[in-house]
Regions:
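Short, Lys/Arg-rich flexible segments
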Residues: 1-186
């Protein structure tokens, strides 16, 4: 005669099911999570301006052209790059909602700084006078207009996320999921 051993295990999965239901409910509207992720991206952009460095690589932005820097100094400006009047830095905006988080700007010249490139060729004409006048090499010049072939602008990326930002985002997502599972998020 062979003896049979029968083991029966009953598991109460109601707590697991309830936790998964809470997580599912929290994921129906991820706006609170996306708001936190947009804040991380916004802080990354703020640091890029403060450090004058690429937020993705950490590399310092290329220095200003010495001639351009001298012209700025003549007008009294000796401040930070990309912040002559503050328009670009103060027009960085966050957008977020269910399933998306983004940081950007609608400033027209932002793209040339973010990606680098060559500005459009154009004519320069006087605003309030009949002619332009300047001195160069001890010689005087007067012209009604001059053609500018465009300027090469180096990339000075200010939008983006680096390794630390990505880690912060991953931790934020994990904390959001953990809080939802534990019933601390609605």
């Amino acid at each position: 005669m062979i003896a049979m051993l029968k083991i029966e295990v009953n598991l109460d999965t109601s707590e697991v099911k309830a936790a998964l239901d809470r997580l599912t409910h929290a994921m129906r509207d991820t706006t609170p999570l996306m708001m936190e992720l947009a804040q991380i991206m916004s802080e990354s952009t703020d640091r890029a301006f403060e450090n004058e460095a690429d937020p993705v690589t950490g590399a310092k932005w290329p220095k200003l052209n010495p001639n351009y820097k001298a012209r700025l100094a003549e007008t009294g400006y000796t401040g930070s790059m990309l912040q002559r009047d503050g328009t670009l830095k103060t027009n960085i905006h966050q957008e977020y909602g269910h399933g998306y988080a983004r940081v950007g700007t609608n400033v027209t010249y932002a793209a040339i700084h973010q990606f680098g490139g060559i500005t459009r060729a154009h004519w320069i004409r006087p605003k309030d006078k009949k002619a332009l006048a300047w001195r160069k090499g001890g010689k005087s010049y007067v012209r009604r207009a001059v053609f500018h072939p465009g300027s090469e602008i180096p990339r000075r990326r200010f939008l983006g996320v680096g390794p630390q930002d990505k880690q912060d985002m991953e931790e934020t997502i994990a904390a959001y999921a953990r809080e939802a599972l534990m019933g601390k998020r609605r």
